């Protein structure tokens, strides 16, 4: 017996990050019962995004053009390249207004158990990106998870072998954070990475 349209919708919603079976079922019923216009708008927006979005030839993020606006901007510092895991990470860094260089988006992180290796993350494209000697420093801004650390380590080795200066985002106590509410691993790393005033 083939799955019903409702089952297919619920299963598709379950494929989204952080959405379990109950949440997927609630969303499906909500869209079908109470927000059909919203469901139609969502379907149109998703269809449009799938039709027009592609990867930037330089930084690998999503864009509607061959080269995204950031990569095409002469106001960006082309000597700095920040490597992030996902476009959402790029967006968070942009919101800080503290960085004006360029980016490279890996579209994931190394995860051998999931079959994600250097080829899937297109490390060769990253290496080609820094080969023209415009980039003077690569800032690794992968997440501080085991997979993110492994990804940063491998990328750092590949870049260092080519004479590229590599730096890593530092870790520490968050701004406005109180020590008693901060985990010991973060405090330990903040102590190791302390700096003089």
From Swiss-Prot:
Gene3D superfamilies: 3.40.1360.10, RecR Domain 1 (1.10.8.420)
Kinase keyword on record: no
Zinc-finger ranges (C4-type): 56-71
UniProt key word Disulfide bond: no
All residue ranges annotated as the Toprim domain in the record: 79-174
Signal sequence coordinates: none
UniProt keyword annotations, A-Z: DNA damage, DNA recombination, DNA repair, Metal-binding, Zinc, Zinc-finger
BP GO terms, sorted: DNA recombination; DNA repair
GO molecular function, one term: zinc ion binding
Pfam families found in the cross-reference section: RecR_C, RecR_HhH, RecR_ZnF, Toprim_4
InterPro entries to which the protein is assigned, alphabetical: DNA_Rcmb_RecR (IPR000093), Rcmb_RecR (IPR023627), Rcmb_RecR_Znf (IPR015967), TOPRIM_dom (IPR006171), TOPRIM_RecR (IPR034137)
HAMAP family assigned to the protein according to its UniProt record, in alphabetical order: RecR (MF_00017)
Family as reported in the entry's similarity comment: Belongs to the RecR family.
Function: May play a role in DNA repair. It seems to be involved in an RecBC-independent recombinational process of DNA repair. It may act with RecF and RecO.
Protein name: Recombination protein RecR
């Amino acid at each position: 017996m083939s799955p019903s349209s409702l089952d297919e919708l619920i299963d598709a919603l379950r494929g989204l990050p952080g959405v379990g079976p109950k949440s997927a079922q609630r969303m499906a019923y909500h869209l079908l019962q109470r927000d059909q216009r919203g469901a139609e708008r969502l379907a149109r927006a998703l269809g449009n995004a799938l039709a027009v979005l592609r990867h930037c030839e330089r930084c690998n993020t999503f864009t509607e053009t061959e080269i995204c606006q950031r990569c095409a901007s002469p106001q960006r510092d082309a000597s700095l390249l920040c490597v992030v895991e996902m476009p959402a990470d790029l967006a968070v860094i942009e919101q800080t207004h503290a960085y004006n260089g360029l980016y490279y988006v890996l579209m994931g992180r190394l995860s051998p158990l999931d079959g994600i290796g250097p080829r899937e993350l297109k490390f060769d494209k990253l290496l080609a990106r820094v080969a023209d000697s415009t980039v003077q420093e690569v800032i690794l801004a992968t997440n501080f998870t085991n997979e993110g650390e492994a990804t940063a380590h491998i990328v750092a080795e590949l870049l260092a072998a080519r004479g590229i200066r590599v730096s890593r985002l530092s870790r520490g106590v968050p701004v406005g954070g109180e020590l008693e509410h901060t985990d010991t691993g973060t405090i330990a790393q903040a102590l190791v990475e302390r700096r003089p005033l």
